[in-house]
């Protein structure tokens, strides 16, 4: 199964204003252009089946989405908001926050893993961790560039794993420096009379 990241997008304006839809569409295309992204699903990709008065068969064959020009945005938004399938999946219950699901391309697996040395396996794991870290930094840059259009937050297992590793490395450095300073202070206190 593919890993994924989740963004939450709360626009400064209403969710279905032209501005908010254009910003969400722009954000989607920007994320989709990243080399490591497989697909991006947003509120704008949800099929609308109750948005027209056409026969059901016709609506199923050529369904519309909120990004289509000839769609009643408010009616479509209400349909998604009242849908038991999509409510709390791509839209919050109050309709103010939208979810963006980013599926990550699978990284080439290590073939014949049982025939590989521990060193080769560790190099492979390090390569994956480094790539994941670079991906997280890249998506955070994209989020930062859209900071003026609303509140955007990042989540998902790859992001949590990367943040944990970053925090642990930082904590080790801080703890190491603290221990070093403690040892120096202790040695100075014990041997200060000799100096």
PLM regions: where:
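Extracytoplasmic/periplasmic
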Residues: 1-48
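Flexible hinge/switch segments at interdomain interfaces of large molecular machines
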Residues: 2, 53-56, 91-96
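Generic detector of short, locally flexible boundary/turn motifs and exposed helical patches
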Residues: 4-6, 53-56, 61-69, 117-120, ...
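Short, glycine/acidic-enriched capping/hinge loops at junctions between secondary-structure elements
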Residues: 17-20, 53, 112-113
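Charged, often glycine-rich, active-site loop that binds/positions anionic groups
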Residues: 21, 25, 50-67, 165-173
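Short helix C-cap/helix-to-loop transition motifs enriched in small/turn-promoting residues
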Residues: 30-40, 49, 66-70, 110, ...
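A short acidic, often aromatic-flanked loop/helix-cap motif at beta-alpha or helix-coil junctions
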Residues: 46-51, 160-162
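Extracytoplasmic
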Residues: 67-194
